[in-house]
């Protein structure tokens, strides 16, 4: 990654998702069945208490923040003790929306019972930066603490920007990732009425019969660390952030630029940042939302950059649904798990790749894989594009 | 002290502050004994206003003076 020459290691990560809480459960979920017959997938019987000192603290956190702290706990446990000054340990976190459930509940309370009944905790619970703030407070991280809200590209943007903090020399470590919990009745109605959600309730990225996404939720948190410092303390290097790209379509608030031109430019920026060529990339973890427009533009972009069927492609959204600002984080975790397991999970739900696409989509069964640089792409409403290139660890 | 009213007060405190009912005694101090900060007290008062069907809200100036359970309970009773 371009900067002052510091390499960026990943030394810990944690995941909370409907298909599994914790990395191993999440991996098993990714290899399991896809989503059918629902417009949103949520974590069943979520219990925040194991991640908080008291029930009161848990109740003061929106579910989106609870997910973030739970994923952070697993990430910090794995990373172990870092030799980093608090002032050089940052938090660069992502969410698409923030504490939407809290906001929606309190709007209803205000309408039904009046202003006096609105919770004094509404503001700290709904604000988009609450998750990043909670992580920094819990772990005493006094470096830059910024929240990125670029819709569905936010998770990828956060990881890229977090890595840049280290590459630039501003931080020696950064906690990064994203969290989302936004499947409220009102938001589902909005996504549904704009015809973004699957009318059949199935997520099947790049399938000929795809008809929209299924809303997901969850969080993933990563501990990024200056590579030489991680090596010096004997930490296990799980992966490396090799490069990142970020740009804008400047085209339309929801539709991707025709031909995926913005996505092409973004992937090329990430490759240039990593000092790699397209042929060095052996896996694309696609945005692959299962919407007609995204997947068509994204497939075209991948073919442009990597050639027809030039690289293995997978999308986890057949299992996870689309967790908006957490998507990029959940998908970077998929890449790291693939590197550990030497397997690419199949794109669940997809049985017939759209014949108009010339991509090598992994479907049906997991594919054996020799870990090598992989690119994870995410694109957000607003024309935000994000790419991050992850290399294997030791 | 009206025990029936106080029991209703205790129930609100247990629900909002997540403390044991046994801790909610008149001498208990919100900050030191119940780990409740000013926002917690605001939330408790809102719950009390609802529980006791108070027609007028308890003004902030009065709340600012409150440090113990007994003081809060007296204010509620005075508004009934």
Question: Which residue ranges define each predicted feature?
Answer:
Chain B
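Thiotemplate assembly-line natural product biosynthesis machinery
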Residues: 1-22, 77-80
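Alpha-helical residues within the helix-turn-helix
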Residues: 15, 32, 50
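Glycine-rich loop motifs involved in handling phospho/adenylate chemistry
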Residues: 25-39, 59-68
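Phosphopantetheinylated carrier protein domains
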Residues: 42-65
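Conserved N-terminal glycine/acidic-rich loop preference
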Residues: 68-76
């Amino acid at each position: 990654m371009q900067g002052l020459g510091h390499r960026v290691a990943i030394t810990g990560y944690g995941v909370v998702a409907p298909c599994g809480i914790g990395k191993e459960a999440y991996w098993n979920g990714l290899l399991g069945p896809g989503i059918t017959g629902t417009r949103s997938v949520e974590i069943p019987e979520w219990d925040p208490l194991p991640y908080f000192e008291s029930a009161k603290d848990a109740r003061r956190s929106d579910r989106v923040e609870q997910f973030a702290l739970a994923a952070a706990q697993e990430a910090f446990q794995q990373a172990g003790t870092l030799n980093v000054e608090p002032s050089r340990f940052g938090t660069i976190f992502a969410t698409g929306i923030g504490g939407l459930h809290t906001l929606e509940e309190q709007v209803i309370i205000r309408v039904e019972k009046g202003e006096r009944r609105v919770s004094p905790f509404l503001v700290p619970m709904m604000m988009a930066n609450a998750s990043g703030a909670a992580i920094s407070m819990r772990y005493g991280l006094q470096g830059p603490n910024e929240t990125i809200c670029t819709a569905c590209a936010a998770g990828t943007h956060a990881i890229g920007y977090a890595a840049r903090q280290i590459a630039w020399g501003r931080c020696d470590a950064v906690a990064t990732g994203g969290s989302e919990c936004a499947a409220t009745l009102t938001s589902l109605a909005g996504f549904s009425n704009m015809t973004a959600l699957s009318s059949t309730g199935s997520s099947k990225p790049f399938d000929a019969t795809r008809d929209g996404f299924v809303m997901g939720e969850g969080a993933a948190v990563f501990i990024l660390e200056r590579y030489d410092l991680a090596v010096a303390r004997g930490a296990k290097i799980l992966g490396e952030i090799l490069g990142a790209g970020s740009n804008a379509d400047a085209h339309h608030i929801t539709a991707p630029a025709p031909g995926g031109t913005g996505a092409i430019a973004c992937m090329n920026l990430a490759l240039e940042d990593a000092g790699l060529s397209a042929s060095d990339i052996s896996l694309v973890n696609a945005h692959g939302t299962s919407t007609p427009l995204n997947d068509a533009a994204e497939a075209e972009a991948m073919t442009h950059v990597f050639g027809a069927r030039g690289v293995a492609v997978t999308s986890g959204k057949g299992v996870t649904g689309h967790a908006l600002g957490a998507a990029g984080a959940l998908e970077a975790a998929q890449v790291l798990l693939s590197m550990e397991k030497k397997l690419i999970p199949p794109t669940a739900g997809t049985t017939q790749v759209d014949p108009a696409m010339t991509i090598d989509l992994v479907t049906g069964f997991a594919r054996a894989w020799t870990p090598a640089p992989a690119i994870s792409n995410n694109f957000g409403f607003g024309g935000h594009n994000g790419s991050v290139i992850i290399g294997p660890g030791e | 002290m009206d025990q029936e009213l106080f029991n209703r007060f205790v129930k609100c405190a247990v629900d909002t502050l997540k403390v044991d009912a046994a801790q909610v005694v008149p001498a208990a101090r919100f900050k030191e004994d119940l780990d409740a900060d000013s926002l917690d007290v605001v939330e408790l008062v809102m719950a009390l206003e609802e529980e006791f069907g108070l027609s007028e809200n308890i003004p902030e100036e009065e709340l600012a003076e409150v440090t113990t359970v007994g003081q809060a309970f007296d204010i509620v009773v005075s508004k009934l």
